[in-house]
Amino acid sequence: MGSFSPLMTYRYHLYSGTGNSFILGEFIPPLQHIVFLCQKEKVDGFLCVEPSEIADAKLTIFNSDGSEASMCGNGLRCVMAHVAQSLGLEDVSIETVRGVYQGKFFSMDRVLVDMTLLDWKKTKKTLTHVLPGMPEEVFFIDTGVPHVVVFVPDVNKVPVQEWGAFLRYHEDFRPNGVNVDFVQTKKEDTLLVYTYERGCERETLSCGTGMLASALVAADVFSLEQDFSLLVCSRSGNIVKIFSENGKVFLEGPVTLLNCSENIGEFAP
């Protein structure tokens, strides 16, 4: 890995996974530069893609605050699309700190990844204390990163920033905290999910692991078939499909390359 000086130029791409926006680069700059770049481009995270000895590529994920994340569903789909197009692949494997993930690139409108974990650590919890109007009953689940799922009658009436920050730092989930998903059932097969993301410390337009968490919990709560299929809509208005098939769970949705050319600039001092 090369060293970086404060005035060194950089090259990267901008991607969006259903509204979840990222810088994708083939380098890892110093953490303060990651924060600067994310603020400059107003994105949710930084995706570093490097060669891998056990997969088609290796992915390291950083939140916009510079902290490293163990998983990002939408970011993973963006990387799957990038690697597939760069290498001319349809089936793609990506190495992460949580293991090697397998996916399939059909088109930019349809990028699928197998998100299956051996243990989702699903737990129903009654919170020790809540804010006025907030449900006491929530569901904890690990979809690569920890999430708390909260079912509400109308997500548009939820103060996502206030409630999200409260639950993200709630004493019941210390010391690491959680991402928070507010979920409304729209139809039998459709969920509306708004997510407060740890590491961004705000609501994002979409969160892949959050939509996955919401779908998995909903499948249990509403006693869906083992092989289920749900459509999940995020704040951005974009929809992903989450489905279970033969014991595996898949996340499928569109990816957008926001900037077709590489960007060139200078790192902040």
Swiss-Prot record:
Pfam families assigned to the protein according to its UniProt record, in alphabetical order: DAP_epimerase (PF01678)
According to the UniProt entry, what is the EC number of this protein?
5.1.1.7
Q: Which UniProt keywords apply?
A: Amino-acid biosynthesis, Cytoplasm, Isomerase, Lysine biosynthesis
The entry's localization annotation reads: Cytoplasm
Question: Which reaction does this enzyme catalyse, per its entry?
Answer: (2S,6S)-2,6-diaminopimelate = meso-2,6-diaminopimelate
Could you tell me what this protein does?
Catalyzes the stereoinversion of LL-2,6-diaminopimelate (L,L-DAP) to meso-diaminopimelate (meso-DAP), a precursor of L-lysine and an essential component of the bacterial peptidoglycan.
Record family assignment? Belongs to the diaminopimelate epimerase family.
Recorded protein name is Diaminopimelate epimerase
Q: Which organism is it from?
A: Chlamydia muridarum (strain MoPn / Nigg)
* Gene from which this protein is expressed: dapF
